[in-house]
Swiss-Prot record:
CDD domains: enolase. Its EC number is 4.2.1.11. Catalyzes the reversible conversion of 2-phosphoglycerate (2-PG) into phosphoenolpyruvate (PEP). It is essential for the degradation of carbohydrates via glycolysis. Belongs to the enolase family. Pathway: Carbohydrate degradation; glycolysis; pyruvate from D-glyceraldehyde 3-phosphate: step 4/5. It comes from the Bacteria. GO terms for molecular function: magnesium ion binding; phosphopyruvate hydratase activity. This is Enolase. The keyword Metal-binding applies.
Length: 426
């Protein structure tokens, strides 16, 4: 066993130039782990709370208070504890905070230490993190969901929906899937240039052109896939993060780019029509986080043929996920480590999803860093899918490169599930 002897946190920057927390955990046997916490732009109302300083410094986004919590009372509470006892450490962190949403110490402070502890224990054991968490059994690489057109809160354009994704489920390996995505990404750039559209990128590295409608983004992806020499719906499928809570007001869905306002039933019809016209296989946050009846209608309508992913509605929280399962809401959950704030609670959410035949997708945030922990978590849990942005910006590509190294490390034991990852669809 490896006792914690020192914890050190500092303020660093994320991919949007905003401060975030980095923590290092040191063990008595020389083991050391480091983790940096990401931050979201479109956040669910019930997410664990990241602690910001307020005031003028960094526009109020400084995290000195969170850093002080780590270097002070969190370190004092954890000194001497065994790093291998992850659940015990995470429970101690939650108890020390004393709130339901980690608002006192800050989920950013707590998560940085939780993840750094796992890294330190893995280092002490001489194992990569994915092996330390996942054990010695067979492991599978995730199918990437590549956000190549950014809109909504992730881009300064007039596209309502937040993400339009390539899902190369027809590949034979992760490395082939990545190659397919890269080739379509460059094909998409050429398509945009040929139409006089902007090729600037958004927070997650995808292109962010102004478009006349949300459907126009799907048309661009179809064109790019074909021009790259692949078949939509055979080699590469499409996915969307609608992020509907960002444009849901007064009981209606406001599609500003299309000058339309739809009620819940009409918006379900709208999404169903897109699913009929395009090879969509995944829709995330199709309904507002508080529109539970709308979610039930959407699931009844499309849940047998589309992955319906709950992000803002579930916020990686097992209590809310359990309610969703009981009420027949969605058939998949997005997993964001900083939504819940500890590694143990993250793993519990993935396990609950699996037990109830919900798929789970390990996901980045729009404000990312060079930290690649989520790639290891995706492999360790065998969740089968990962969302970590487009094929540009080092904060996104770092995760893909980590997965390439893991695939190489696993060798012949590496499995890529492909279309089988959508096991709960007809």
């Amino acid at each position: 066993m490896s006792a914690i002897v020192r914890i050190q946190a500092r303020e660093v920057l994320d991919s949007r130039g905003n401060p975030t927390v980095e923590a290092e955990v040191y063990l008595d046997n020389g083991g050391m782990g480091r983790a940096i916490v990401p931050s979201g732009a479109s956040t669910g109302e019930r997410e664990a709370v990241e602690l910001r300083d307020g005031g003028q410094r960094y526009g109020g986004k400084g995290v000195r208070k969170a850093v002080e919590h780590v270097n002070g009372e969190i370190q004092d509470a954890l000194l001497g504890m065994e790093a291998e006892e992850q659940e015990h450490i995470d429970a101690a962190l939650c108890a020390l905070d004393g709130t339901e949403n980690k608002a006192r110490l800050g989920a950013n402070a707590i998560l940085s230490v939780s993840l750094a502890t796992a890294h330190a224990a893995a280092h002490a054991a001489g194992q990569p993190l994915y092996r330390y968490i996942g054990g010695l059994g067979p492991l599978q690489l995730p199918v990437p969901m590549m956000n190549v057109i950014n809109g909504g809160a992730h881009a300064d354009n007039d596209v309502d929906m937040q993400e339009f994704m390539l899902i190369p489920a027809g590949a034979e390996s992760f490395s082939e899937a990545l190659q397919m995505g890269v080739e379509v990404f460059h094909s998409l750039k050429a398509v945009l240039q040929s139409r006089g559209l902007a090729t600037t990128v958004g927070d997650e590295g995808g292109f962010a052109p102004n478009l006349p409608s949300n459907e126009a983004a799907l048309e661009l992806l179809m064109d790019a896939i074909n021009k790259a020499g692949y078949q939509p719906g055979k080699d590469i499928w499409l996915g969307m993060d609608v992020a509907s809570s960002e444009f849901y007001r007064d009981g209606r869905y406001h599609l500003a780019s299309e000058r339309r306002e739809l009620d819940s039933a009409q918006f379900v019809d709208y999404l169903a029509a897109l699913a009929d016209r395009y090879p969509l296989i995944s829709i995330e946050d199709g309904m507002d986080q508080n529109d539970w009846e709308g979610w039930i209608t959407l699931t009844d309508r499309l849940g047998d043929r589309l992955q319906l992913v709950g992000d803002d509605i579930f916020v990686t929280n097992t209590t809310i996920l359990r309610e969703g399962i009981e009420r027949g809401v969605a058939n998949s959950i997005l997993i964001k480590l900083n939504q819940i704030g500890t590694l143990s609670e993250t793993l519990a959410a993935i396990e609950m999803a699996k037990v109830h035949s919900y798929t789970a997708i390990v996901s980045h945030r729009s404000g990312e860093t060079e930290d690649t922990t989520l790639a290891d978590v995706a492999v360790a849990t065998g969740c089968g899918q990962i969302k970590t942005g487009s094929l540009s910006r080092t904060d996104r590509v770092a995760k893909y490169n980590r997965l390439l190294r893991i695939e190489e490390d696993l060798g012949d034991a590496a499995r890529y599930p492909g279309l089988a990852t959508f096991y709960n669809l007809d």
